[in-house]
C-alpha cells in the first residue's frame, strides 16, 4: 500500500499542491507554520474524513474558500485505486473511491490504513482510556470484518439505553436493550481480546529494541469485571445508572493496561520512554496488519526531532523503514532526519508558505 500521487486543494494554508511521493521514506521540511504538517494532515483527512489536530473539520478549509478537495492515487496488492474527498464549510462531505460514491467514512479507513506519530498521538498513554480504546478498535476494525457492525450496534444501543435512563424509564423498558447490548458486547470484546493477544506477540520484540531491560506487561480490560455476567451486572446497576443518566459498565469502558511490575507505565517510565513505547505500539499495529491482511499501513510522523533525541530518532526511523511501509516524516531542518538515517530519504519535499516543491 502506497500513495503514488496526492492532490491537495484549499487545505489550511495550502491553496494547491501536487505530490508524487516515493514508496519509501518521504522527508517534508520547512519552517514552523510553513504548511508541512498540513500535508500530513491532508493525507490523514483523506483516510479518516477528519483531522488529527482539530475536531472541527471546517477549520481545515482555507480561509477564503468554501470547500477543500483531496485526491490520491494509490497502489496495493490488488492493483490501484483512486480516492477523492470534498468537504464543504457547511459540513457536507463527498467521498468517491474509484469513481463510486461512498456513504460510510469507515470505507475510507479500510481503503487507506494510516498510522500517526505526532505530538498529539502521545495522548495514548498520557490521557484517559478513550485514546487506548480507539487504538485497540483501529486494529480490531482492520483485523475482523465483523467488528464495525458489532461496535456500531453497541454504540446505537447505548445511546438508546442512556436516553431511557435520563427519561427515568423502568427497568422493564430497558431489559430489551440490555439483551441486545450483551449480545453485541460479547462479540466486540471477543474480537478486541483476540486482537490484543495477537498484538502482544509482535510487540515484545519491538519493545526489546526500544526499551531493553524494561519488562512491560500489556493486558486488555473489557469494561466490566471478567468474573461477572454482564446481563446480571446491568440489572444490579440499574439504580446507579438511573441516578447518573448513563451506563456505568460495558464495552465502552474498556481499556488497555500497560504496566512495569505492579506500576502503570505512566508512573514507572520517563516521558521519553513513554514516547518510545507509543512508537512501538504504532509500529506493532502496522506490522500486525501486514501479517494478517497483507496490507501495509502508511506512516505519518510529525515533528520527530522535537519529540525524540538523536539516538532514539535513529532507532525509530530504522524500525519504520524496516517495515517496508511508505513513510512521511516532517522536520524543520532536514539534517535532523537525514543524519538519523542509514541511507538518504527516497524523496525530499520543501514547504514554504503553503507551496510544496520537490528537492532533486
From Swiss-Prot:
Q: Which InterPro entries match?
A: DNA-binding_RecF (IPR001238), DNA-binding_RecF_CS (IPR018078), P-loop_NTPase (IPR027417), RecF/RecN/SMC_N (IPR003395), RecF_2 (IPR042174)
* Domain of life assignment: Bacteria
Residues given in the record as ATP binding sites: 30-37
Keyword DNA repair attributed: yes
Protein's cellular compartments: Cytoplasm
One BP annotation, GO: double-strand break repair
Q: Which UniProt keywords apply?
A: ATP-binding, Cytoplasm, DNA damage, DNA repair, DNA replication, DNA-binding, Nucleotide-binding, SOS response
Give the signal peptide, or none: none
The family line of this record is: Belongs to the RecF family.
The record's function comment reads: The RecF protein is involved in DNA metabolism; it is required for DNA replication and normal SOS inducibility. RecF binds preferentially to single-stranded, linear DNA. It also seems to bind ATP.
Recorded protein name is DNA replication and repair protein RecF
Amino acid at each position: 500500500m502506497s500513495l503514488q500521487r496526492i492532490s491537495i486543494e484549499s487545505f489550511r494554508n495550502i491553496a494547491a499542491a501536487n505530490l508524487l511521493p516515493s514508496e519509501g521514506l518521504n522527508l517534508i521540511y520547512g519552517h514552523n507554520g510553513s504548511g508541512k504538517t498540513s500535508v500530513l494532515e491532508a493525507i490523514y483527512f483523506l483516510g479518516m474524513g477528519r483531522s488529527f489536530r482539530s475536531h472541527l473539520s471546517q477549520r481545515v478549509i482555507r480561509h477564503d474558500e468554501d470547500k477543500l478537495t483531496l485526491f490520491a492515487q494509490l497502489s496495493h496488492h490488488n492493483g490501484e485505486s483512486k480516492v477523492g474527498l470534498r468537504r464543504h464549510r457547511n459540513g457536507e462531505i463527498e467521498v468517491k473511491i474509484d469513481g463510486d460514491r461512498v456513504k460510510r467514512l469507515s470505507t475510507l479507513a479500510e481503503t487507506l490504513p494510516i498510522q500517526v506519530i505526532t505530538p498529539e498521538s502521545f495522548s495514548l498513554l498520557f490521557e484517559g482510556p478513550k485514546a487506548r480504546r480507539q487504538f485497540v478498535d483501529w486494529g480490531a476494525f482492520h483485523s475482523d470484518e465483523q467488528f464495525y457492525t458489532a461496535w456500531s450496534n453497541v454504540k446505537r444501543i447505548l445511546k438508546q439505553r442512556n436516553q431511557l435512563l435520563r427519561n427515568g424509564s423502568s427497568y422493564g423498558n430497558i431489559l430489551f436493550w440490555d439483551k441486545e447490548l450483551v449480545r453485541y458486547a460479547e462479540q466486540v470484546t471477543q474480537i478486541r481480546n483476540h486482537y490484543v493477544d495477537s498484538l502482544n506477540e509482535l510487540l515484545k520484540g519491538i519493545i526489546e529494541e526500544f526499551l531493553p531491560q524494561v519488562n512491560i506487561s500489556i493486558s486488555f480490560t473489557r469494561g466490566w469485571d471478567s468474573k461477572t455476567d454482564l446481563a446480571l451486572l446491568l440489572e444490579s446497576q440499574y439504580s446507579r445508572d438511573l441516578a447518573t443518566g448513563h451506563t456505568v459498565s460495558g464495552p465502552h469502558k474498556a481499556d488497555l493496561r500497560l504496566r512495569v511490575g505492579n506500576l502503570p507505565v505512566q508512573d514507572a517510565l520517563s516521558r521519553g520512554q513513554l514516547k518510545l513505547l507509543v512508537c512501538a505500539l504504532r509500529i506493532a499495529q502496522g506490522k500486525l496488519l501486514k501479517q494478517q491482511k497483507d496490507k501495509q499501513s502508511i506512516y505519518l510522523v510529525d515533528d520527530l526531532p522535537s519529540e525524540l533525541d538523536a539516538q532514539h530518532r535513529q532507532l525509530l526511523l530504522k524500525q519504520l523503514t524496516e517495515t517496508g511501509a511508505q513513510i512521511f516524516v516532517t522536520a524543520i531542518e532536514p539534517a535532523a532526519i537525514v543524519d538519523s538515517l542509514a541511507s538518504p530519504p527516497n524523496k525530499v519535499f520543501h514547504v514554504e508558505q503553503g507551496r510544496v516543491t520537490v528537492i532533486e
